[in-house]
Amino acid sequence: MINWFPGHMAKSLRELKEKQKVFDLFIILLDARLPLTSFNPEIYKIANKKPILFIFNKADKTNKDKINAFIPQYQKMGEVILSNLKDKKSILKINSKINNIYKLFDEKNKLKNKLTPPLKCVILGIPNIGKSTLINALANSRVAKVGNIPGITKSEQWINCNKYLLLDTPGILMPKLGSDDVGAKLAIVDSIRIDALNINEVIVEIYKLLSKTNKWVLEKINLAPSFDEEQIFAEINQYARRNKILKAGNEIDLNKSIKLLLQYFKNIDNIIYD
């Protein structure tokens, strides 16, 4: 079974629980190709008593028709934005949404004759989901640290975006993934470090996942869907022969073939794995 939960993730989860009261807004990034699997219930347990903004990143790579079916369940928990963090329009939309949330805080404070400080926003999500990309885009190269904030260590860097402050956090996975399907889904979007796993095991689980959810991805390069490990490697060997992925002596380079297939799988567009 594919699993990966290094010690620093457990530590980050503990620290979030301890500092929950410090944050005004939880910005939770999700992968639009994994609208269910990229949701970490451990993070939601910490965030669910505060305002939440869900941002589905990589909306440009998902299936536009299917993703909309998942949105209503998230709208029950918070605000939702579909985005491509490399697109300026998406960043403007996110910035506008955060500023609108600030206005709600400000309106409440005005009734109490109180000034509204910048919102303290923490950005959360599984690894490689785009947290740093979002911070860089919203900050627009402003990387100055702000002053000390109670409950936060000096080593943690807040980015000042005028009406709000942003705090990045390490990517956090679920302590137990629960099934090979989940591990394969996270591996195919690079949220699990494949180089820390057995590459043969990874390719088998991803191949099975695609055979189950998106067999057209395999058929596009003349691979037959299969759930049998022996047959899967037979298909990979044939793929290597067809594409002349060989070592000296006309021997199949299995490792290179697997890496090329993984790269192909990761770059597929118009897809949902959940």
Q: Can you say where each PLM-predicted feature lies in the sequence?
A:
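Helix-rich effector regions associated with P-loop NTPase G domains
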Residues: M1-F26, A32-L34, F39-P41, I46-L53, ...
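Conserved P-loop NTPase mechanochemical-coupling segment
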Residues: M1-I2, I135-V146
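Canonical P-loop GTPase G-domain recognition
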Residues: L53, D60-G125, V143, L246
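Short phosphate-engaging motifs
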Residues: S90, G130, L165
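Alpha-helical scaffold elements adjacent to nucleotide-binding pockets in ATP/GTP-utilizing enzyme cores
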Residues: K93-K97, A137, E205
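Glycine-rich phosphate-binding P-loop
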Residues: L119-N140, T169
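Short, flexible micro-motifs
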Residues: N128, T133, V143, K154, ...
